[in-house]
Regions:
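Active-site micro-motifs of SAM-dependent methyltransferase domains
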Residues: 20, 38, 68
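Residues marking the start of alpha-helices
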Residues: 17-19, 36, 104
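S-adenosyl-L-methionine-dependent methyltransferase catalytic module, highlighting the catalytic core
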Residues: 3-5, 13-15, 41-146
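A short SAM/SAH-binding and catalytic strip from SAM-dependent methyltransferases
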Residues: 29-41
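A short acidic, Gly/Pro-enriched loop at the edge of an enzyme's catalytic core
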Residues: 16-31
Length: 146
């Protein structure tokens, strides 16, 4: 959250930067996130932080928008002046906490488990049948490689 330091609170909610978590190594048995990592500028760094704070045998279970027919699409890179250089049409998702939209750095694809492996996480992708907006939701289950 803008203006809140990592580890600080806003309205009773702890705020963290997943690229630089304030938790000690091996702090958690389980970490979950729902449609977050597509908004993380350096997702590999964020995945490494998840691996760092997972206890041995711990699990990271998360969802992201995933195109199972293509490799990950990188939508933009940070330019030297701090602006975003778009490599694909920009995409934004709503942020109910801030009442605004958030840039989507990538749309994950069939190579997501390779991206997690770069960060020291062994992963598999499962598809869960749901009712509502989407009928099949990809759920990624990852474990630290230690």
């Amino acid at each position: 959250m803008d203006g809140v330091p990592p580890g600080g609170e806003l309205d009773g909610i702890r705020c963290e930067n997943v690229e630089c978590l304030t938790f000690a190594n091996e702090s958690f048995d389980l970490i979950t996130s729902t449609d977050v990592f597509e908004h993380v500028e350096d997702d590999i760094r964020g995945f490494r932080e998840i691996a760092r704070v997972l206890k041995p045998g711990g699990a990271f279970i998360f969802t992201v928008p995933l195109d199972e027919t293509s490799p990950t699409l990188i939508r933009g890179k940070r330019a030297a002046d701090g602006s975003i250089h778009h490599l694909a049409p920009p995409e934004y998702h709503g942020d109910p906490m801030r009442g605004m939209t958030v840039y989507t750095w990538r749309t994950y694809g069939i190579d997501i488990t390779d991206r997690l492996a770069q960060a020291g996480l062994a992963a598999r992708c499962e598809f869960v049948v749901t009712h509502g907006v989407a009928m099949r939701v990809p759920v990624i289950v990852a474990h630290a490689n230690r």
